[in-house]
Amino acid sequence: MKFAVIGNPISHSLSPVMHRANFNSLGLDDTYEALNIPIEDFHLIKEIISKKELEGFNITIPHKERIIPYLDYVDEQAINAGAVNTVLIKDGKWIGYNTDGIGYVKGLHSVYPDLENAYILILGAGGASKGIAYELAKFVKPKLTVANRTMARFESWNLNINQISLADAEKYLAEFDIVINTTPAGMAGNNESIINLKHLSPNTLMSDIVYIPYKTPILEEAERKGNHIYNGLDMFVYQGAESFKIWTNKDADINSMKTAVLQQLKGE
């Protein structure tokens, strides 16, 4: 079976390394490549994928929303998130999914077992935030709180959440067990500070969905304060495992995938 990840740029993607490690571990001769598709060529997506004879593919920035009009069916989770990161090609039909939310939550559950009783604050109200919030809302008992700079961003949400400003989030920071940053602040090349951690409780788990850099500025600051931190590496691995399950109906080897990514990040 042939798979790929599409994006622009795409040379930095660790998806091929991760998926190939999984294939090797499971004794599969499947292939996985990275395809750079510029925005101006995206209208040729059906032709490009058809020529590659793919059975499924992942989508990353900047095409997660752009792919939707080309799909025959979109899964509920992807509709809720407003973005697609996984496509299954079956009987000539393109089916879109979003595994980012479930990927993040599965990873978070492994480090925070009592997740269903946690008071959670999500920073940012974009597609990543929405996907994670919808997944958490399925079983977390306390109402989720989502903070954003502008309240207008919540107009596309139909989830029962507490909607607050970032200024209010700073004030009430001590009330949360878990704080999750879903904004680009702290990504490689972006040193913007999203929130002041002055009122962060020492017992709060500080999380970021980014894994490059391995510790974003907000995670470094929380760690200096003595808090436990959790980055986006597991989200990346688990979303990949969920994609593999959608394509093949098989369980992925999580350990081999994570090891391959860690080795790559360490430059081994």
UniProtKB/Swiss-Prot annotation:
Classification lineage: Bacteria, Bacillati, Bacillota, Bacilli, Bacillales
Residues that coordinate or bind NADP(+): E76, G124, A125, G126, G127, A128, N148, R149, T150, M151, A152, R153, I209, G232
One Pfam family in the UniProt entry: SDH_C
Name listed for the protein in its UniProt record: Shikimate dehydrogenase (NADP(+))
Active-site annotation: K64 (proton acceptor)
Binding site for shikimate: S13, L14, S15, T60, N85, D100, Y211
Oligomer and partners: Homodimer.
Taxonomic source organism: Staphylococcus aureus (strain NCTC 8325 / PS 47)
GO cellular component terms given for this protein: cytosol
One of the GO biological process terms: shikimate metabolic process
